[in-house]
Amino acid sequence: MNVTSKPGELVPESDVAAIMRGTHGDPFRVLGMHGGGGAPLSVRVFAPQAAEVAVLGQGGEVLAPLERIGAEGFFAGTVPGEEKFPYRLRFVSGPHEWEADDPYRFPEVLGELDEYLLGEGRHYQLYTRLGAHPAEIEGVQGVSFAVWAPNARRVSVVGAFNAWDGRRHPMRKRIGVGVWELFVPGLHTGDLYKYELLGPSGERLPLKSDPLSFAQEAPPATASVVHGLPEAEWHDAGWMQERESRQRRDAPISIYEVHAGSWRQGLDYDALAEELSAYVREMGFTHVEFLPISEHPFTGSWGYQPIGLFAPTARFGPPEGFARLVDRLHRDGIGVILDWVPAHFPSDAHGLANFDGTHLYDHADPRQGFHRDWNTQIYNFGRQEVANFLQASALFWLDRYHVDALRVDAVASMLYLDYSRNAGEWVPNRHGGRENLEAIDFLRGVNERVRLDHPGCITIAEESTAFPQVSRPVEDGGLGFGFKWNMGWMHDTLGYFRRDPIHRKHHQNDLTFGMVYAYSEDFVLPLSHDEVVHGKGSLIGQMAGDRWQKFANLRAYFGFMWAHPGKKLLFMGGEFAQEREWNHDASLDWHLLDDPSHAGMKRLVADLNREYRKRPALHRMDCDPEGFEWIDAGDSENSVLSFLRKAPGEKPVLAVCNLTPVVRSDYRIGVPEGGEWREILNSDAAIYGGSDVGNPGGLQAEEFSWHGRPASLRLTLPPLATIFVTPA
């Protein structure tokens, strides 16, 4: 049966019914202007909010009223003319009258190249096409929407502009790539929206946020916000030119890890730009690493269960605010590292889980697709569209926000199919092994794209296993990361400093074993947020001994860490010996700096950063075995160890650690050259809160062979302390 609204105008009743029910999968076949080329022109509109609809010409004149068909607001009618033309619509509802452009008169949003790249899984700037983009099409301002949902029966964009009615703005499906698109005239930056989808069986799914939204409502609200691609006003050209040299293996890299919400509570991005940047400059760190900034619904996840992989969290202001934060850090000579989470995603109803009514982003088999430790879904890295989505997210932060590095979270969980699973709870790879071959290929692909598209940017792996060549080039069989966190070093050394000094002589290996594998990867030494949560206590709280010994131990530990090969990372609060375990709902205890012991710790960390940056011997050969030499690793009876840090053509630095609360006088240590030496740093100095035992003034190396070296120094070793000594 056909419904006739005007002579020559036929609208299949089934199409009218499907549009009014909101189940039609091809709205452009029904709505908009049809005919031309000899056939009568007709216009069909679904407007349940209107009592009358008329078609207007380009000059605003009424060309034809449309006839209402049925009670649900479907209008149709013929209009004069032989070929299709731009038109507008006038709506009347009671005393209200308004005009608007018809979304269904506009052409396709995606081009042929977009379709090709999407089909290939190589649209690395996916964010320039999918998502919500303010645009002008045929002289009309509006917003272009596009979302991947290949298994959905119908997708609509909804918001206050259509009373969240999914029947009113159904989208066009690009069959070949499974992307739904629609240009909606009259929408603006700041408008809220979501997608309403019908699943494969026609079931209405929970409203979904846009996977490629550039802004989200502040949680607990969950709508996406229309926002164009970030277009910040950048002033960081100097940093960008120098960035590559500041992030090489031979550069000093000292990272301050920050949770933006609890460093100092109540700060937005702009306040952080002022206060955090000034503080990091004062402390001498080279980089700030932010716990995940991408939008996440649950604050207690610290950002590690993100949903908005292209949206800075709205908790601290708009996206432009985050750009200004990065810009300010760069202008102050500080690099920016973001924690990035491609391993898994939360199952919140408005997110990626069951996005189009299927396991679109994850695996249907829970042995592959569900992470029991975190109650999250695991991405299907073998699906090229999913890999492309994640790759585009990584590149987005580097491209649009000038981020310098990505610290990739939970890499170990990606690399192994049996990660945290018992026998029978995982599916072997095609060779029968436990390695996740698709994830390995994905990580290599991301790292290669970063290297090719953003030279000078780096990636850093949080990887806790012995998986080989994590930080080696892809062409050499590696994963292609720039650096890897040295979790083994952290575990061993932190365990050592938890021990009572009386027992340490039996555990010297905890401090020395790290050098056995120190150059198997390019390492970062991490004292991260993970070490000060879940009942572990603060760093200072984990140190052995009474209050004085705890502070002395932590100062000695920091001295050992800054002297040890590897880049440095310290979580906020550790630098001044925060005493409470970290709480994401509270600020750091800045009032502790009124206590000389805490203020002294802060000064020590600043001085360690200064020495580390100033002295090539301490950083240039961090990743080269030629930059390290044991003097004596074997004096376990006294819990003393000594080693040299070196760089070609530079003065060496001798580090000596005395890790019992006993002063050791006239302690002889072999050195590579005679002449005058001097103590340049002493963690026991009074300015750091120590007992001020040490080696003031100059030190004369004696021509007395010791430890296999031609000369030696007689030192006073302060209790529970690390000292640095160098030729004068």
Curated annotation (Swiss-Prot):
SUPFAM superfamilies (alphabetical): (Trans)glycosidases, E set domains, Glycosyl hydrolase domain
InterPro entries: A-amylase/branching_C, Branching_enzy, GlgB, GlgB_N, GlgB_N_E_set_prok, Glyco_hydro_13_cat_dom, Glyco_hydro_13_N, Glyco_hydro_b
Residues of the signal peptide: none
GO cellular component: a single term: cytosol
Enzyme class of the recorded protein, top EC level: transferase
Enzymatic reactions: Transfers a segment of a (1->4)-alpha-D-glucan chain to a primary hydroxy group in a similar glucan chain
EC number(s) given by UniProt: 2.4.1.18
GO molecular function, one term: hydrolase activity, hydrolyzing O-glycosyl compounds
Pathway(s) of this molecule: Glycan biosynthesis; glycogen biosynthesis
Keywords, sorted A to Z: Carbohydrate metabolism, Glycogen biosynthesis, Glycogen metabolism, Glycosyltransferase, Transferase
Any GO BP annotation: glycogen biosynthetic process
Matching CDD domains: AmyAc_Glg_BE, E_set_GBE_prok_N
Active-site residues per Swiss-Prot or TrEMBL entry: 409, 462
One Pfam short name: GlgB_N
Family according to the record: Belongs to the glycosyl hydrolase 13 family. GlgB subfamily.
Record function comment: Catalyzes the formation of the alpha-1,6-glucosidic linkages in glycogen by scission of a 1,4-alpha-linked oligosaccharide from growing alpha-1,4-glucan chains and the subsequent attachment of the oligosaccharide to the alpha-1,6 position.
Subunit structure: Monomer.
Protein name: 1,4-alpha-glucan branching enzyme GlgB
Gene: glgB
